[in-house]
Design a protein with these regions (language model features):
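Thiamine diphosphate
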Residues: 2-134
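Cysteine-centered iron-sulfur cluster-binding motifs in ferredoxin-type domains/subunits
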Residues: 27, 56, 156-167
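Disulfide-bonded cysteines in secreted/extracellular proteins and peptides
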Residues: 40, 142, 162-165
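A generic structural motif
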Residues: 65-68, 138-140, 165
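Short, structured interface segments
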Residues: 127-147
Length: 167
């Protein structure tokens, strides 16, 4: 999940669904640091939306990043309320994350392509200046899905340039 080196992308990694509630708890406890929460779309539907409602209700300035890849990647690519299919593969109502986030009262919401690092970075830097809840939805299908895998070519390691990061 990007916690350990070489990425070191997070300070805390708890359990699936805890990020938004833990970040909100830090704010409510008086921590002066800005708190970020990172959560996948499926986990957001299962447990994260309740915590985000508390963030909105209490006006906490948590920045939540919802990684929308339209599937439950972490546990085996099961369908979820945002995929448009049931677990049995039957058509279902597709929950619109952005509409749901706005409906619970979050006003600062943006959807960006997950691989557009510049857009993500500039958005987060801009949002550090505001004192309100915000949600960034990163949008890209899971790379583990068979139809997505076909888009990626095998990579060759240039050994003399390798720094041993294991990525």
């Amino acid at each position: 999940l990007g916690v350990v080196p070489p990425l070191s992308a997070m300070d805390t990694c708890g359990c699936m669904g805890a990020s938004t509630g833990v970040a909100h708890g830090g704010v409510m406890a008086g921590d002066s640091e800005r708190h970020f929460a990172v959560i996948g779309d499926s986990t957001f539907f299962h447990t994260g939306v309740q915590a985000l409602m508390n963030v909105a209700y209490n006006g906490s300035n948590v920045i939540t990043i919802i990684m929308d890849n339209r599937i439950t990647s972490m546990t085996g690519q099961q369908e979820n309320p945002g995929s448009g299919l049931t677990l049995q593969g039957k058509p279902a109502n597709e929950v619109d994350i952005e509409a749901l986030v706005r409906a619970i009262g979050i006003k600062t919401v943006k959807r960006v392509e997950a691989y557009d690092v510049d857009a993500i970075e500039s958005t987060l830097k801009e949002w550090l200046k505001i004192d309100e809840p915000a949600v960034l939805i990163t949008d890209h299908a899971c790379a583990l899905l068979p139809e997505e895998r076909k888009q990626y070519l095998a990579l060759d390691v240039i050994e003399e340039d390798c720094n041993g990061c294991t990525l």
